[in-house]
Amino acid sequence: MELWYTEQHTENVRFSIKVEKEIHTEKTEFQRIDVLEAKEFGRFFTLDGLMMVTEKDEFIYHDMIVHVPMATNPNIKNVLVIGAGDGGTIRELTRYSTVEKIDMVEIDKRVVDICREYFPLTSCKLDDKRVNVFYEDGLKFIRDKEDEYDLIIVDSTDPFGPGEGLFTKEFYGNCYKALREDGILVNQHESPYYDNDAAAMKEAHEKITKFFPIIRVYQAHIPTYPSGHWLFGFASKKYHPIKDFDAEAWNKLGIKTKYYNTDLHVGCFALPTYVRDMLNGLTD
C-alpha cells in the first residue's frame, strides 16, 4: 500500500508527496510533529500537518531569509531569531564571523530536540558558542527588549496556532523597539497566490508599515510551500536593501551558497504585477 503526505492548500487544491516511511510522530504541548521520509524530497517534518522543512529545498528558504539582510548591512553583530527550531537559519547566520551573538527563541522545545536528532543538515550549528536558545513565547520574550539587536529574523510558522502572536501589531511594534537605530527586521511573509494566504500576507505587511520607514518585499521559489511562490518582508530603520547593497563587499566574504547570490539579491525585489497591485503602494 502506498503512503502519501497531503497538505490542503485550499478547499480545491492539495499538495502530495509519496512517503517511503514514517520516522517519528508525537503530540507536544503546542502541536503535532511528524517526521517522514520521501524519495523525492528526502526527510521532512510537518507541524499540525503543515510542511515546515524538507532536506531537498530547505536551502532556498534559509539562504533568502538570512543572506539578504546580512548582505544589506555587513556590520550586523547581534541577531534575534524567533522560531527557527530546525536550526537552518542559525546555520546560515553562523557563517558570518562578524556576528557576535545570536539569540534564538522557540516556543516548543520538542521541535528543537527532534530536529537535533533527525535533521543534522539544519541543526548542525545550534551548539555554536554564539548561540543562546530560549524556550519561550517570542511575543513575550521581545516585550522587554530595547535597542538591543541589529537584525531580527522572524522565522515563524503560519499566522494561526502557536505562531499567531507573531503576526500582530503589538509584536511588530516591539520588534521596532528592540532594534538598534539602524536595525533590520525580516520575516517570512507567506504566499501571495491563494486568497487566504494572500490576505494573511497583506494584513501582516500593513501592520509592519506602521512602524518602519523602509519597507520592501522580496520573493523566492520554494517548491514544497503553498503555490511555490513565497514572499519575505524586509523592514529597516536605515538601510535600503538595494540602494545600500554592496555586492562586491559581500562577494569578498567568500560565502558559498546554493540559492542566494548578489544578482538574485537585486532581482528578488522585482515583484510580479499582481503582487505589487496587492500591496498597493505599501512599500517605500
UniProtKB/Swiss-Prot annotation:
GO cellular component terms, semicolon-separated: cytosol
Location(s) in or outside the cell: Cytoplasm
Positions of S-methyl-5'-thioadenosine binding: 31, 106, 137-138, 162
Catalysed reaction, written as an equation: S-adenosyl 3-(methylsulfanyl)propylamine + putrescine = S-methyl-5'-thioadenosine + spermidine + H(+)
Domain of life of the organism encoding this protein: Bacteria
Enzyme Commission number(s): 2.5.1.16
UniProt xrefs under Pfam families: Spermine_synt_N, Spermine_synth
Domain PABS as annotated: residue spans: 2-237
Purpose: Catalyzes the irreversible transfer of a propylamine group from the amino donor S-adenosylmethioninamine (decarboxy-AdoMet) to putrescine (1,4-diaminobutane) to yield spermidine.
Complex formation: Homodimer or homotetramer.
Protein name, per record: Polyamine aminopropyltransferase
Organism, scientific name: Clostridium beijerinckii (strain ATCC 51743 / NCIMB 8052)
Lineage: Bacteria, Bacillati, Bacillota, Clostridia, Eubacteriales
